[in-house]
Amino acid sequence: MGLTQRELEIIRERLGREPTAAELAFFTSHWSEHCSYKSTKMWLRELPGSAPWVVRGRGTDAPLVEVAHGLYVSFKIESHNHPSAVDPYNGAATGVGGIIRDILTVGATPIALLVNLHFGPPEDPHAKWIFSNVIKGISDYGNRVGVPVVGGETWFDEDFTYTPIVLATCVGVVEAEAVPKGYVEPGDYIVVAGLGADRSGLGGSAFASKTLEGGEDLGAIQVADPLMGKKLIDVVKEVSRCVKFIKDLGGGGLATALAELSHWFSLGVEFHLDKLHVRDASALPEELLISETQERLIFVISPRDLPCLEEALRKYEVPYSIPGRFVKSDRVLVMWKGVKIVDIPISLADGAPEILWPQEPYQPSDIPEIPEPPIDKAIDIVLSSPNVAKKESIYMRFDFDVGVRTAVKPGEGDAAVLKLYQRGQLGLVVKGDANPRYTFLDPRLGAANAFVKAYRNVAVVGGVPLAAVDSINVGSPERPQVYWRFVQAVQGLKEAATELEVPIVGGKVSLYNEYMGRPIKPTVAVVVLGKIDDVSKANRALWHDGDKIYIWGVTKGEVGGSEYLKRVHGILAGRPPSIDYAAEKEIVAVIQSWLGKISGATDVGLGGLITALAKMAINSGIGGEIDVCKAPAETTRLDYLLFSESNGRFIATGAEGPGVAIGEAYGEEFVVKCGGTLIYKRGVEELKRLMSL
């Protein structure tokens, strides 16, 4: 059933009776870990989320960040890991649909999607099956609703062979006056619009709150309908000014939606379930209550404004019903053909008891003594790694130009840049990052690294970071070491957000990411959003013929958890790179002072200095000659100089630039030296083939 004995006792005690079948379904769904966050919310409360430009932070379906006077941006991240493991096409597609609907709840028009994807090794048949279907699911849904996929990252690791991590972020924009009013009064109607309810997604939230053991029920997987998703986008554009509130009907179905609405507004709900429009007339009332049928929204509207909503719903042929209303009481009341089937106090409906699990620290092993390998072979191995490879074969399957807002396209720069036509040349810069190896070795420092990396990506392109959302994905919290890793990851995010002065305005926790008793490497993704005053000045990761090549920052001998250590030596050990927050903030100021004066820029991160330089050569189609030993460094080992993933660094190119000059761009060959010694030489076309996924 999904409820613990203690939870059942609390329910019986508070109700003063045995719960009905519908109430048991209600609590099983809404008190699941997926919906209630009962093992995590006490830690998440510590995350800083406020700033003068944050209009609405965590706590509702989507935040709002002011990027110009009267212009708001909303962005939100969602995971769909368990569904994507079992039915990768529909799991990924419904993940995209769900995050789009979250953005619709604030009246925003979705303008972009980003995806952070983690799969098993690309040569593994099962991982390849998941990979290809996830990509197709994202592509089909995004393309059909007209929202471009503008960026993301793809990671490959054996831990994700059977338990992929599938994260989708949606960005939307809305004028302040178009945001729904945000208040509710007794007598206001609850209108359910979209697909008729059926049995699809039954128990989806409970399914996402347990580990995978093989042979999972496909009935728990929702099915996407992008045509209806597009209709809902069109409806919201027309009615956001006349409705009071919009709520996504997602995880937990009506049970969660009604519990959250009554809790947010401290008002009772009276809901006649038999008046709900359905596609499956044989569905039981308790099934309708927790069904996670996709492409549905709840609109809260006053009776006098109802014609405004009904006109739009009819115009776009969106099915709807008016089964509920708000009342002046302290209860969630659900009726079925005149009979009460749910009668729960609001405080109990949304009051899953919190759980603090035991914690057990993990101590990573130190890096053993490793010989310095033949450098040219080591470079080839790292550059051909799927994790650092160019992902053109993936993003070319997405329509990233629909809406003609994408100023910096996938593969062109460190982050996506989106035009905001409402305010001239003003644009958004957005990027998501994660490194499961880092968060495995040191979850606190690893989570902070994910934040810093996304922050630096936004900064290097030319954005001023404003806000962040995060996604924490771990195994079962009942495992002391897993729960410790989760808590440490939250502390790392808290530290980074505080030091960088970038509030965390939303997030998602996904637990029980295990297969056959084996938890995944903890994976913390952070998406940072910033703004740029003039999108035409955004930096791309390239250079022009004759440009000088500069490096900013110091390379340290930091190869713990690095691509080099894993791919060349087969070792996962050490600690992630250290962080100097002041140095990271300085990068924002430096790049801002050079905007429009340099040809391009890219950060130095995964795969180290050699990878950053190689990507710029490929993007440009122009070679160059670089003396890496001119780069400021605190290591004497050449392999560490090339492959260290130290923070606080970026490459800039142009006639002049910030930092230390280490080379020049020209010709068709990528030539790397140390002093007068040649250490690596490849043609740009050969390099491109080497780094293709």
From Swiss-Prot:
Q: Does the keyword ATP-binding apply?
A: yes
Q: Which residues bind substrate?
A: 79-82, 101, 222, 292-294, 510
Q: What protein does this entry describe?
A: Phosphoribosylformylglycinamidine synthase subunit PurL
State the top-level EC class: ligase
Localization recorded for this chain is: Cytoplasm
Q: Which SUPFAM superfamilies match?
A: PurM C-terminal domain-like, PurM N-terminal domain-like
- Residues binding ATP, per UniProt: 37, 76, 470, 507
Q: Which residues bind Mg(2+) 2?
A: 102, 248
- Binding-site positions, Mg(2+) 1: 78
According to the record's subunit comment, the protein's assembly and interactions are: Monomer. Part of the FGAM synthase complex composed of 1 PurL, 1 PurQ and 2 PurS subunits.
User: What keywords is this UniProt entry annotated with?
Assistant: ATP-binding, Cytoplasm, Ligase, Magnesium, Metal-binding, Nucleotide-binding, Purine biosynthesis
- Residues of the active site are 34, 80
Q: Which reaction does it catalyse?
A: N(2)-formyl-N(1)-(5-phospho-beta-D-ribosyl)glycinamide + L-glutamine + ATP + H2O = 2-formamido-N(1)-(5-O-phospho-beta-D-ribosyl)acetamidine + L-glutamate + ADP + phosphate + H(+)
Give an example GO cellular component term for this record. cytoplasm
User: This protein's superkingdom?
Assistant: Archaea
In which broad location class does this protein mainly occur, judging by the first location in its UniProt entry? cytoplasm
Q: What does this protein do?
A: Part of the phosphoribosylformylglycinamidine synthase complex involved in the purines biosynthetic pathway. Catalyzes the ATP-dependent conversion of formylglycinamide ribonucleotide (FGAR) and glutamine to yield formylglycinamidine ribonucleotide (FGAM) and glutamate. The FGAM synthase complex is composed of three subunits. PurQ produces an ammonia molecule by converting glutamine to glutamate. PurL transfers the ammonia molecule to FGAR to form FGAM in an ATP-dependent manner.
Query: One Pfam family name from the record?
Result: FGAR-AT_linker
UniProt pathway annotation: Purine metabolism; IMP biosynthesis via de novo pathway; 5-amino-1-(5-phospho-D-ribosyl)imidazole from N(2)-formyl-N(1)-(5-phospho-D-ribosyl)glycinamide: step 1/2
Q: Does the keyword Zinc apply?
A: no
Give the GO molecular function terms: ATP binding; magnesium ion binding; phosphoribosylformylglycinamidine synthase activity
Q: Which GO terms describe its biological process?
A: 'de novo' IMP biosynthetic process
Query: Which family is this sequence assigned to?
Result: Belongs to the FGAMS family.
